Protein backbone atom coordinates (compact mmCIF):
# COMPACT_ATOMS: atom_id res chain seq x y z
CA UNK A 1 0.00 0.00 0.00
CA UNK A 2 2.83 2.39 0.88
CA UNK A 3 4.48 1.68 -2.47
CA UNK A 4 1.22 2.38 -4.29
CA UNK A 5 0.76 5.72 -2.49
CA UNK A 6 4.39 6.67 -3.15
CA UNK A 7 3.99 5.87 -6.85
CA UNK A 8 0.78 7.88 -7.04
CA UNK A 9 2.42 10.85 -5.27
CA UNK A 10 5.37 10.68 -7.67
CA UNK A 11 3.02 10.73 -10.64
CA UNK A 12 1.13 13.71 -9.30
CA UNK A 13 4.26 15.69 -8.43
CA UNK A 14 6.07 14.70 -11.61
CA UNK A 15 3.15 15.57 -13.88
CA UNK A 16 3.73 19.28 -13.40
CA UNK A 17 7.47 19.03 -14.00
CA UNK A 18 7.62 16.46 -16.77
CA UNK A 19 7.16 19.01 -19.52
CA UNK A 20 3.43 18.51 -19.76
CA UNK A 21 1.46 21.71 -19.85
CA UNK A 22 -0.45 22.28 -16.65
CA UNK A 23 -4.18 22.22 -16.96
CA UNK A 24 -5.27 25.74 -17.79
CA UNK A 25 -7.54 27.47 -15.39
CA UNK A 26 -9.97 29.74 -17.15
CA UNK A 27 -9.57 33.41 -16.37
CA UNK A 28 -12.46 34.91 -14.50
CA UNK A 29 -15.05 36.37 -16.85
CA UNK A 30 -14.98 40.13 -17.13
CA UNK A 31 -17.84 41.77 -15.35
CA UNK A 32 -20.46 43.02 -17.79
CA UNK A 33 -20.52 46.75 -18.31
CA UNK A 34 -23.05 48.31 -15.98
CA UNK A 35 -26.27 49.25 -17.72
CA UNK A 36 -26.64 52.97 -18.19
CA UNK A 37 -29.30 54.22 -15.80
CA UNK A 38 -32.00 56.09 -17.69
CA UNK A 39 -34.42 58.74 -16.56
CA UNK A 40 -37.79 56.97 -16.46
CA UNK A 41 -39.96 57.80 -19.46
CA UNK A 42 -37.06 59.21 -21.50
CA UNK A 43 -34.27 57.79 -23.65
CA UNK A 44 -31.63 59.80 -21.77
CA UNK A 45 -29.15 59.07 -19.01
CA UNK A 46 -30.23 59.74 -15.45
CA UNK A 47 -27.34 62.21 -15.15
CA UNK A 48 -28.74 64.53 -17.86
CA UNK A 49 -30.41 67.78 -16.80
CA UNK A 50 -32.24 68.11 -20.13
CA UNK A 51 -33.18 65.42 -22.62
CA UNK A 52 -34.18 65.70 -26.28
CA UNK A 53 -35.51 62.81 -28.37
CA UNK A 54 -35.36 63.94 -31.99
CA UNK A 55 -37.32 60.94 -33.30
CA UNK A 56 -40.32 61.51 -31.02
CA UNK A 57 -39.90 65.33 -31.13
CA UNK A 58 -40.03 65.60 -27.35
CA UNK A 59 -37.91 67.21 -24.65
CA UNK A 60 -37.78 67.00 -20.86
CA UNK A 61 -36.13 68.73 -17.93
CA UNK A 62 -34.82 66.36 -15.29
CA UNK A 63 -33.14 66.62 -11.92
CA UNK A 64 -29.94 64.89 -13.05
CA UNK A 65 -30.79 61.96 -10.76
CA UNK A 66 -33.26 60.11 -12.99
CA UNK A 67 -36.47 62.06 -12.34
CA UNK A 68 -38.45 64.13 -14.84
CA UNK A 69 -39.23 67.59 -13.48
CA UNK A 70 -40.94 68.98 -16.61
CA UNK A 71 -42.22 67.47 -19.84
CA UNK A 72 -42.49 65.91 -22.21
CA UNK A 73 -42.96 68.98 -24.39
CA UNK A 74 -42.89 69.33 -28.15
CA UNK A 75 -39.38 69.90 -29.49
CA UNK A 76 -38.42 70.24 -33.13
CA UNK A 77 -34.84 69.92 -34.36
CA UNK A 78 -33.04 70.71 -37.56
CA UNK A 79 -33.46 69.75 -41.20
CA UNK A 80 -31.46 67.16 -43.11
CA UNK A 81 -29.29 69.98 -44.45
CA UNK A 82 -28.90 71.48 -40.95
CA UNK A 83 -29.19 68.53 -38.54
CA UNK A 84 -29.25 68.86 -34.79
CA UNK A 85 -26.13 67.20 -33.36
CA UNK A 86 -26.66 64.20 -31.11
CA UNK A 87 -24.64 63.43 -28.02
CA UNK A 88 -24.06 64.78 -24.55
CA UNK A 89 -23.29 68.47 -24.15
CA UNK A 90 -22.93 71.12 -21.45
CA UNK A 91 -24.91 74.33 -21.35
CA UNK A 92 -22.51 77.05 -22.44
CA UNK A 93 -24.49 80.26 -21.98
CA UNK A 94 -27.99 81.74 -22.04
CA UNK A 95 -29.41 84.81 -23.77
CA UNK A 96 -33.07 85.75 -23.26
CA UNK A 97 -33.11 88.16 -26.23
CA UNK A 98 -30.74 86.48 -28.68
CA UNK A 99 -30.86 87.39 -32.37
CA UNK A 100 -29.03 85.05 -34.74
CA UNK A 101 -26.28 86.83 -36.62
CA UNK A 102 -26.21 83.90 -39.08
CA UNK A 103 -29.92 83.89 -39.99
CA UNK A 104 -31.09 87.32 -38.70
CA UNK A 105 -33.74 85.55 -36.66
CA UNK A 106 -35.09 86.20 -33.19
CA UNK A 107 -34.27 83.33 -30.82
CA UNK A 108 -36.01 84.19 -27.53
CA UNK A 109 -34.95 82.38 -24.37
CA UNK A 110 -31.88 80.77 -25.96
CA UNK A 111 -29.94 78.18 -23.98
CA UNK A 112 -26.79 77.34 -25.95
CA UNK A 113 -25.34 73.87 -25.44
CA UNK A 114 -23.27 73.27 -28.61
CA UNK A 115 -21.59 75.68 -31.05
CA UNK A 116 -24.43 77.73 -32.61
CA UNK A 117 -27.04 75.25 -31.24
CA UNK A 118 -29.59 76.21 -28.60
CA UNK A 119 -33.00 75.52 -27.14
CA UNK A 120 -35.17 78.56 -27.98
CA UNK A 121 -38.71 79.65 -28.72
CA UNK A 122 -39.56 78.63 -32.26
CA UNK A 123 -42.04 76.98 -34.56
CA UNK A 124 -43.11 73.44 -33.73
CA UNK A 125 -44.05 72.90 -37.37
CA UNK A 126 -41.05 74.43 -39.17
CA UNK A 127 -37.66 72.82 -38.62
CA UNK A 128 -34.64 74.83 -37.50
CA UNK A 129 -31.07 75.25 -38.70
CA UNK A 130 -30.00 72.74 -36.02
CA UNK A 131 -31.42 74.32 -32.87
CA UNK A 132 -34.20 72.83 -30.76
CA UNK A 133 -37.44 74.76 -31.20
CA UNK A 134 -39.68 74.80 -28.14
CA UNK A 135 -43.02 76.48 -27.56
CA UNK A 136 -42.85 79.79 -25.67
CA UNK A 137 -43.94 78.36 -22.30
CA UNK A 138 -41.48 75.48 -22.58
CA UNK A 139 -38.58 77.67 -23.73
CA UNK A 140 -39.14 80.00 -20.77
CA UNK A 141 -39.07 76.99 -18.44
CA UNK A 142 -35.89 75.56 -20.01
CA UNK A 143 -34.30 79.02 -19.82
CA UNK A 144 -35.24 79.42 -16.14
CA UNK A 145 -34.13 75.92 -15.10
CA UNK A 146 -30.91 75.31 -17.03
CA UNK A 147 -27.60 76.90 -16.08
CA UNK A 148 -24.13 76.93 -17.61
CA UNK A 149 -22.49 73.57 -16.96
CA UNK A 150 -25.76 71.60 -16.89
CA UNK A 151 -25.84 68.45 -19.01
CA UNK A 152 -27.98 68.22 -22.16
CA UNK A 153 -28.39 64.89 -23.94
CA UNK A 154 -29.77 64.74 -27.49
CA UNK A 155 -30.68 61.35 -28.97
CA UNK A 156 -32.12 60.44 -32.36
Show the residue positions of the predicted features:
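Intrinsically disordered, low-complexity
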Residues: 2-90, 95-97, 154-156
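Exported/periplasmic cell-wall-interacting domains
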Residues: 34-49, 79-88, 93-156
Amino acid sequence: MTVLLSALAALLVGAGSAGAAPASIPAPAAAPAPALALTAGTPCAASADACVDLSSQQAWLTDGQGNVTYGPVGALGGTRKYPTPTGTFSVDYKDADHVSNLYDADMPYSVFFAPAIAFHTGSLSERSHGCIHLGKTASKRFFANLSPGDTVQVVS
